[in-house]
Regions:
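A small-residue-rich subset of transmembrane alpha-helices
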Residues: 1-25, 107-148
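Juxtamembrane boundary at the C-terminal end of a transmembrane helix
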Residues: 175-185
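Hydrophobic residues within the alpha-helical transmembrane core of Major Facilitator Superfamily
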Residues: 4, 49, 88-89, 127, ...
């Protein structure tokens, strides 16, 4: 359930962002298009940097225990419909995921590729964004005894370092978006 909601959420977020921004920038050409597209990518990049800074400052300090979000505790007990809804909400509404998906959609909108290229790009992004989740789910389903201890250690490491990992990802994504935005000008 969670994985289905996650994949649908990723596809919906990137597709909707691409569609809306394509409609907004579609009739524009020349200087107007370059200004709007450049500012759009700069805004996505700067927002990613702001969120990265917030995540870095909110990370647990040495000696303090990190807290998993409250939604993470209820995933295992959720029925398939609730798990799907949770996956969809997390893929579309979490600040980091929203920025990464909106950035991908914005890039697809301003690049103006053919429809089939957009379709394949969105599907590729959904596969990549879901692959780690799929590995964990398949591992638990088919080899729970073998993967439980390593995944437990991984979860402990993520608890301690999640803020730093998210900050690094958002810094890189923000840098790419800013670079694209500056390149358009």
């Amino acid at each position: 359930g969670f994985l289905v909601g996650w994949v649908v959420g990723v596809v919906a977020l990137v597709s909707l962002t691409t569609l809306v921004l394509r409609l907004v920038t579609g009739p524009m050409t020349g200087t107007a298009y370059r200004v709007v597209a450049g500012l759009l990518m700069l805004a996505v990049g700067v927002l990613a940097w702001v969120v990265a800074l917030r995540r870095w400052r909110a990370r647990p300090r040495p000696g303090r225990k990190a807290q998993w979000p409250s939604w993470a505790e209820g995933v295992e007990e959720a029925d398939p419909a609730r798990a799907s809804g949770l996956g969809f909400a997390l893929a579309t509404l979490d600040t980091k995921n929203l920025l990464l998906g909106a950035g991908a959609g914005a890039y697809l909108a301003i690049a103006r590729p053919a429809f089939t290229t957009v379709l394949w790009s969105v599907l590729a992004l959904a596969v990549i964004a879901s692959s780690a989740l799929l590995v964990v789910i398949l591992g638990f389903r088919f080899a729970r005894a073998r993967v439980e201890a390593p995944l437990g250690r991984l979860a402990e490491g993520l608890e301690l370092n999640l803020g730093g990992i998210e900050s690094a990802v958002l810094l890189v994504a923000g840098g790419l978006a800013v670079g694209v935005g500056l390149g358009i000008f």
